Every structure is written in structure tokens, then in C-alpha cells.
Amino acid sequence: RGIFAPMISFNQKIKKRAKDINSYLCVGIDVNAKSLGSDNFEDLKIHSKKIIDATRDIALAFKPNFAFFERWGSEGFKWLEETVDYIGSDSIIIADAKRGDIGNTAGQYAESIFDHFGFDAVTLNPYMGEDSINPFLVHDDKGVFVLCRTSNSSAHIFQNQKLNRGQFLYEKVAEWADSLNHKNNIGLVVGATVPQELSRVRDLAPNLPILIPGVGAQGGDLEKSVYEGNKSGIGIINVSRDISFSGDCSVESIRSSAQSYVKKINEVLNV
């Protein structure tokens, strides 16, 4: 009888890749006409391949944002399929879909993202509770990143509301997500624009991967984000526009920007 190796969990997989390529950078793929300066659909598709070609060997993960593909209808969904295929199975691909439904609906979303498109992980909105998360936790090797304390300017309206025990809502989300991590495949999303909250989340969920958007165009604090995100567990720095549309938008400019981020991150981590 053959000997089968145990399945590696998603969180183990992302830590291993970070160590193997010495990178904690996630490259967001948010290709749009305004940023590129062209509303030609083929130009957008070509540019998405440029981003991947320029960063394939130095990106810990890629994060295509569904909205930028869905906006183009059926052709956009085909483009998304082609993008996942073009990235390939050696990289980690996170679906920035922010799904948040329950039951059978959530199950269909999970099948779409994991089985049809072939993503390794997905961003999820926890507002509807455990029913919106569990359908995505079926496979140990597929991960979820739960929105916890996001980088947008109005996030505090709900996320910094105090609960009965004086705990902030985002703190409750961090503890709750940590308690669901039975298969070692749950992570959190916390913005680089709120380093104090990021530090608090890391204390509450010391072992969960944290995906950290908001660096670059949103003006988040890179150094503090790297330090707080990686003082335990792994903190993954997501950069989209500042890499994808760097300089003259050539492969060389995109790669140079990505390399600069990897270098800055590794300097903070002393790796």
C-alpha cells in the first residue's frame, strides 16, 4: 500500500512559501481603465499578465479583486479564469471577493471560488456569523481571511463600536475567528492604516495569518504593519496600485516597485 503524506493546511502552506521565497508581499490585481489610462479590454488583460510576469517569483501571494473582473460581465469572468490559470498552482491565489452570505448560498460561493476557479483562499465578511464562514472551511488546504479591522476611512463606525464588556467589535471578531481555527486555515484582514488596532488583533490572535491591505496608495504605515503583523504568526503585506501602475506601467517598473517593497519588508524583519 502506498504511503500518503498528510494534507498540509492552508496556514502551513502560506508560511512555507514565505520562507521558501523570502517574501511577505501579496500583489493585488485590481486592473482598471482609469489607472491604466486605457478602456480597451485587451489592454487590461495584457496588463494583468504583465503584473504576474513581473512579480511571479517574488510574490508570496496574488489577490485578484473580483469587482474589477465582474464589471466586464461574462468576458470578465473568463478573464478571471484565465488569470488564475496564468498565475498557476505554484503561487498562492487569494480571491478578494468579500463574500458574506449563509447556508446553501455560501456553499455555492465556496464551490465557485475553490472548485471552479481554483483559488487557494478567499476574503469573507463575518457580519452574518459562523453560518457565513463554515461552508468555506470544508477543505483544510483552502483558507479564509475574515474581515476584522479594515483600512477604509469609515470602518470605525461599526468596527470600533464597544460591546457590553467594553470590548471593541473588531476585537470580538479577532477572538471569534481564532476560536474557529480548528483546521488551521483561518486568517484575518486588518488594515495598515490602523497600526494600533493591528497590534491589538495580533495579541488576540497570535497565530492567525493577517492579510494587511492599505499600504501604498492608501498611505498605511509599512514599517509598523510589518512589525506588528509578524511579531507572532505571519503578516502579509498587500500592495495593489503602487505596484501594478508603477512608473510607466512596464514590466520593469512593476518589478522594481515590487522588489522595493520586498526589500523594505525584509529589512524590518531582518531576513
Question: Residue locations for each model-derived region?
Answer:
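Conserved anion-binding
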Residues: 32-33, 101-189
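Conserved, mostly hydrophobic/aromatic
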Residues: 27, 62, 96, 122, ...
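C-terminal helical cap(s) of enzyme catalytic domains, especially alpha/beta-barrels
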Residues: 223-234, 241, 245-271
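N-terminal active-site wall of soluble small-molecule enzyme domains
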Residues: 59, 64-116, 154-155, 178, ...
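Short, well-ordered coil/turn segments that N-cap beta-strands
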Residues: 21-25, 58-60, 89-91, 118-120, ...
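Acidic (Asp/Glu)-rich catalytic clusters
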Residues: 18-20, 52-58, 82-88, 135-140, ...
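Conserved N-terminal beta1-alpha1 strand-loop-helix module at the mouth
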Residues: 7-92, 165, 252-266, 270
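A C-terminal functional module that forms or caps the active site or interfaces directly
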Residues: 188, 192-238, 242
